Amino acid sequence: LLESYKQAVRPLLPYLPWLEQSAGKRASSIYSGQDIGVNSVSFPVYDGTLLNFVREATKSPLMDRNYAYVYTRHRIRTHQEERDIIQKAGWKEWDILRGILSKYVLGGRTKGNLWSEAVSERIFYLVLKQMQEIIEFWDKTPANGKL
């Protein structure tokens, strides 16, 4: 089980430094060239690193399409509640971490501001960091659990 968790998280870890640096900042902007606001609906332009992260996360087994159930069952409503649960999460709460990550990755496909929100509110960073810490704590291999 631990090995499958490591394999799922490993492709996302290279994005940790970028997610940490981007915390509190917007990872998207609204395209407004060629007077687009006058004739049509404006649309967001995302940071390339964010798009690559979302693409990797979408392919990973960490995605839980039933993420809404995690939010309902644990009564998660605000970003602060998300951060509190993430910080307290351990091995047994792995599914909660998956649910929170999934809400933003999968939900961002239809609700344009979710990806940016997850970066600025540090949700992506905190979930990945906590997953990494859980794996490193429980992994007793000679490499000392380093991913």
Please give the residue ranges for each predicted region.
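Amphipathic alpha-helical binding modules
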Residues: 99-146
